Amino acid sequence: MFFPLKKKVLSIIDIANQLNISQSTVSFILNGKSKERRISDKTTEKVLKFIEEVGYKPNLLARSFRTGKTNIIGLMVESIANPFFSNVARFIEENAYKNGYKILYCSTENSLAKSKELLQMFKDRHVDGYIITPAEGLKEDIDKLSKTGAPVILFDRCFEGGNNDYVILDNFQSTYNAVEHLVEQGYKEIGFVTINSLQSQMQERLHGYEKAVDHHQLNHYVKEVGFNMEDENVVAHIVDFLSRKKQLDALIFSTIYLGINGLKAIKKLNLRIPEDIAVIAYDENVIFDLHTPSITTIEQPIEAMSVQLINILLDKLAAKNIINHKVTMPGKLIVRESTAKKLKS
């Protein structure tokens, strides 16, 4: 049986020999430095036409060894399927691409073991910088990575007492403001449904709720559910919570998926929004806008946060700025029908 010979992959040396020009000239042209090196348009066009005809593709790993750069940024989030993280990834990718970088992204599903594996994968790929939504327990690995000089920006959450760069939401104040809004609308028995987690953003949201209800001398009603719990089980837990706490007249959900499952639970109990119970949910999503009645949400400034993330990282990659950036951005309460003024009974 005849096996065709594998087509030889051309190198810069081959191109230089074929065109009878120096290897350095070919290298400068391929790296977009024709003008900088005053290489004639004729020679540049000659090289570009040739590589197009032969289908030349540069060895990116070899280039990274020469330049010390891959022009790839590693983006690690909790779940790329989550609308919040997918929107963030979209904006980061757009801004990175405009600046000559590509994004390699992945999901941790909040697993420490998976996070460690993915972090090693990024290192093996020689990414230039990291944007990370860290799982619990990843602090030591992040600190080691930062000590190598690699630019690392944390997103959505950070580590207490850490010295990392980060861009996060003001979770405490955002939740505090949500409680304030409900109180102003006449609601007094306000519950908080959240994830059983030590992550900084979840803790800050819980603390914001607790501080606000304490300020108004109201009762605490907190329901925590597991992060990896199936949707139907989350719904069942919220149904049980509402059934046991019939005095509740308002609920705040600390994540988008808790908000969606909370609406299912409320529907199962045939409760009316907002007549029987008012609702506020993190984060802004078309589902909440289209729901009848429409749902009040706590919106994170996704585009502004994404721009901050990529700008800080690009500055660090260009060695323009070595100071630490700790950016906390305000949330916005999008008031809709689900928190209409409570009718006096």
List each model region and its residues.
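N-terminal helix-turn-helix DNA-binding module of bacterial transcription factors
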Residues: 1-69
